[in-house]
Regions:
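Walker A/P-loop nucleotide-binding motif
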Residues: 54-76
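A short, basic N-terminal segment
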Residues: 1-58
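A short beta-strand-to-loop transition that corresponds to the Sensor-1 phosphate-sensing loop
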Residues: 151, 183-189
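Mid-core helix/loop region of P-loop NTP-binding domains shared across ATPases and GTPases
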Residues: 4-19, 23, 42, 106-113, ...
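Post-Walker A helix-loop "phosphate-sensing" segment adjacent to the P-loop in P-loop NTPases
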Residues: 79-90, 120-122
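A short helix-turn-beta junction within AAA+ P-loop NTPase domains corresponding to the substrate/partner-engaging
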Residues: 194-210
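Conserved small helical "lid"/interfacial subdomain of P-loop NTPases
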Residues: 209-235
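Conserved catalytic segments around the Walker B and adjacent sensor/switch elements
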Residues: 84-102
Length: 235
């Protein structure tokens, strides 16, 4: 097999022996490809996990154009810090909480998504004030170290007032819980976040640079050609 499928990485050669249907199914599944830019972003995120609590916690904007892998990076970060059940306390620890932004940046929709990510199901009868209190309580209880908000672009669908209220909510949570917040989105969303001077001071930025014809792109293509279970080498 090593000679027959020498164009593939050794760990992936067995998949070339699968049926066509099984190989198509394999190709459709998500998988992580370790590339320098993505690994550099993960290093920035890892620094936030171990950051000690203080009055003004550092936060991060992970931004780039559509298709640059923002969601894949924050999903990978979340999986590397998956929830762990503590037998002694009977509680799950969730060091990294990944939340997708709701379609509109209203407080009730935001806290609904946040509490849903915290596995809270009884939400229909809760007021915004109650949801805020419950979110603060649960985030502290599960010992969340970093809160990640993906697709922060959806904030732009709100009115100027809704956007200001949402930015105030971010600032409130990071101040109250003393945890970093990561926002992933486009350049436009980054500029919107930075309109709040209080947030601009604490949000660092990591830009995912667009692909160009350089070593990084060739490395990406080489990775694909080595792991895709094609029985013949690409030319």
């Amino acid at each position: 097999m090593s000679t027959l499928y020498g164009h593939l990485f050794p760990a992936y050669r067995e998949y070339a022996e699968l049926t066509d249907e099984a190989r198509v199914d394999w190709l459709r599944r998500d998988r992580w490809i370790s590339l320098p830019q993505a690994e550099a972003a993960l290093c920035h995120l890892e620094d936030l996990v171990i950051y000690p609590p203080r009055g003004r916690m550092p936060c991060l904007l992970l931004f780039g154009s559509t298709g640059m892998g923002k969601t894949e990076i924050v999903s990978r970060f979340s999986k590397l810090h998956a929830p762990q059940f503590d037998i002694r306390t009977g509680l799950s620890r969730m060091p990294v909480l990944l939340v997708q932004m709701p379609p509109e940046p209203t407080e009730d929709q935001f806290y609904t998504e946040l509490l849903t990510a915290l596995n809270c199901v009884e939400l229909s009868s809760l007021s915004v004030r109650s949801m805020r209190a419950e979110a603060r309580h649960l985030l502290a209880e599960v010992e969340t170290k970093v809160l990640v908000l993906d697709e922060i672009d959806k904030m732009l669908a709100g009115t100027p007032r809704q956007q200001r209220v949402f930015l105030n909510t971010i600032r409130f949570l990071t101040n109250d819980l003393k945890i970093p917040i990561v926002c992933a989105g486009t350049e436009e969303a980054r500029m919107a976040v930075l309109t709040d001077p209080n947030l601009a001071d604490r949000f660092g930025a990591f830009e995912l640079m667009p692909w160009c014809n350089d070593h990084a792109l060739r490395q990406l293509l080489a990775s694909f050609s080595g792991l895709l279970p094609l029985r013949r080498p690409s030319r």
